[in-house]
Each structure stands twice: as C-alpha cells, then as structure tokens.
C-alpha cells in the first residue's frame, strides 16, 4: 500500500512538472485503483486501513489541485477571448479614424486639368507632402540614426503608431529620405574634429 502512495505522489509531481500528460496520469490512477481493489479483496484483517486513508487524502488533495488548474485555465481562456474582442474593437475604431483622416483635406489629392487638345479631360495628380508634424517626427528619427538609417520592424511599427502612417508609407518615406535628405543631414551634422 505504501507503494501506491509513493506512485500517486510521484505521478502528481510529474504532472505538475509537465513530465506526463492527462492521459498518462489517468492510466497511472486506474492502475493504482485496480491494485487497491485487488489488495482490498485479499486483505481480510484490514491492516492497511491507515494506508488506504492516506491514499484517499492524497488523491482528494490532488483532485482539488486538478480542479483548481482547470478553473485557472478556463479563466485565462475567457480573459484571452475578452482581450481579443477588445483588440478587435480598438482595431475597428482605428481603421475608421484612419479612413476619416485619409478623407480629410490633409491627404486629399488635387486634380488639375491640363489645357489643350486631347489632354483637356485628363487629370494630373499632384504629389502630396505629409503634414509638418509627421515629417518632423520622421526627420528626428533619421537625425538620431544617421549612421544606420534603416528602422527595424519594431521601430517602424512605433513610428507608424506615432504618425498615423501605414508601414508602407513609412518604408517609402525612409527610402526617399535616404536619397534626398540624408546626404544633406550628414554634411550638416558630421563632426569635424
């Protein structure tokens, strides 16, 4: 009977260390249960009553730990679902704000008609500059990283959140800035010691 107590304690320890899974644990408990039934039918004097009581107490404690674990997992799962719903809601609002912002005058394109002949009905789309606040944020980052002007993915995401631009717009801005702005910045800020 002491062997069964040791087996259940070892199984409990292995389970909580993730050395065995639910299926293995059930097999161990069923084997112990079968052994106890066999042992009980051969134990006519009842000398192992104390061992049986200890085994029952250990199993009850183990059972309560397993129930606690399942409750924690279900609470965690519920919180994950709630968090995902909140994130979806935030993303929806952000998309709506972005759509409204892109529709605003700051990012609207101006069509100019060309004069003359066949081209009179065609339109020319003018290149749009970003607002000064956005350019200032991006230039500040560029100035800070003159030696290696390539933002990482994390930095791009941070700049995207800070400016409200899409990642592709951030990429394009830096590609253009490395050709147009960076040479002048390097001349201006190089230290002539």
From Swiss-Prot:
Keywords: DNA-binding, Homeobox, Nucleus
A molecular function (GO) term: DNA binding
Entry's Gene Ontology BP terms: regulation of DNA-templated transcription
Annotation: DNA-binding region: 123-185
Signal peptide, first to last residue: none
CDD domains reported in the protein's UniProt record: homeodomain (cd00086)
GO cellular component terms, semicolon-separated: nucleus
Disulfide pairings: none
Subcellular location(s) per record: Nucleus
Family stated for the protein in its record: Belongs to the TALE/KNOX homeobox family.
Listed PANTHER family: HOMEOBOX PROTEIN TRANSCRIPTION FACTORS
Protein name from the UniProt record: Homeobox protein HD-12
Record organism: Encephalitozoon cuniculi (strain GB-M1)
């Amino acid at each position: 009977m002491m062997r069964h107590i040791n087996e259940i304690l070892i199984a409990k320890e292995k389970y909580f260390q993730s050395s065995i899974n639910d299926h293995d644990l059930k097999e161990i408990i069923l084997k112990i249960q079968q052994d106890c039934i066999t042992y009980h039918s051969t134990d006519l004097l009842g000398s192992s009553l104390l061992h049986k009581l200890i085994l029952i107490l250990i199993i009850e404690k183990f059972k309560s730990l397993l129930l606690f674990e399942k409750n924690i997992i279900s609470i965690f799962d519920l919180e994950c679902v709630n968090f995902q719903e909140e994130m979806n809601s935030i993303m929806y609002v952000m998309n709506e704000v972005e759509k409204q912002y892109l529709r605003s005058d700051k990012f609207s394109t101006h069509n100019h008609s060309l004069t003359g002949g066949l081209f009179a009905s065609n339109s020319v789309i003018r290149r749009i500059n970003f607002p000064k606040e956005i350019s200032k944020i991006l230039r500040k980052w560029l100035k800070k990283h003159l030696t290696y002007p390539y933002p990482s993915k994390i930095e791009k995401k941070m700049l995207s959140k800070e400016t409200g631009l899409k990642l592709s717009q951030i990429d394009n801005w830096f590609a253009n800035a490395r050709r147009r702005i960076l040479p002048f910045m390097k001349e201006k800020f190089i230290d002539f010691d």
